[in-house]
UniProtKB/Swiss-Prot annotation:
SMART domains cross-referenced by the UniProt entry: Spt4
Keyword field: Centromere, Chromosome, mRNA processing, Nucleus, Transcription
Disulfide bridge positions per record: none
Protein name in UniProt: Transcription elongation factor SPT4
Subunit relationships: Component of the SPT4-SPT5 complex. Interacts with RNA polymerase II.
Domain of life: Eukaryota
Name of the gene: SPT4
Gene Ontology MF: a single term: zinc ion binding
């Protein structure tokens, strides 16, 4: 993990989790860099409104992944194709309908909420 992932105790209240990939970063980092996994379709960088609607301050548990491709917990949490970092186990909140439609229609990505309300179909 790089030191850029370090969050001081005072910054903990500024942590947010992406509603799609569940990566946990400060709101300032989302503002400066966007989401390292979802930026292509979320466009969070330099967009406070998009950050507010596509990330959540309400999340449970944190997993630190150094090598997601080799981690069984990353596979179980559907994180194995993402960058190393801190990830929430559950993220509360609803992704806006327009973002969800864009994901499914333009990018062919099935959105599965990370709050545990829907389960992935194995079919």
């Amino acid at each position: 993990m790089s030191s850029s992932n370090y969050v001081t105790t005072g910054q903990a209240r500024n942590l947010r989790a992406c509603m799609i990939c569940s990566i946990v970063m400060t709101s300032q980092r989302f503002q400066n860099e966007g989401c390292p996994n979802c930026e292509e379709f979320l466009h969070l960088q330099h967009s406070p409104d998009q950050i507010e609607s596509c990330t959540s301050q309400v999340f449970e548990g944190v997993i630190t992944l150094a090598n997601p491709t080799k981690s069984w917990i990353a596979k179980y949490q559907r994180l194995d194709s993402y960058v190393p970092g801190m990830y929430a186990i559950k993220v509360s909140g609803q992704l806006p309908d327009d973002v969800r439609s864009t994901l499914e229609d333009e990018y062919r990505i099935q959105y599965i909420p990370r709050d545990g309300t829907e389960v992935e179909n194995d079919a």
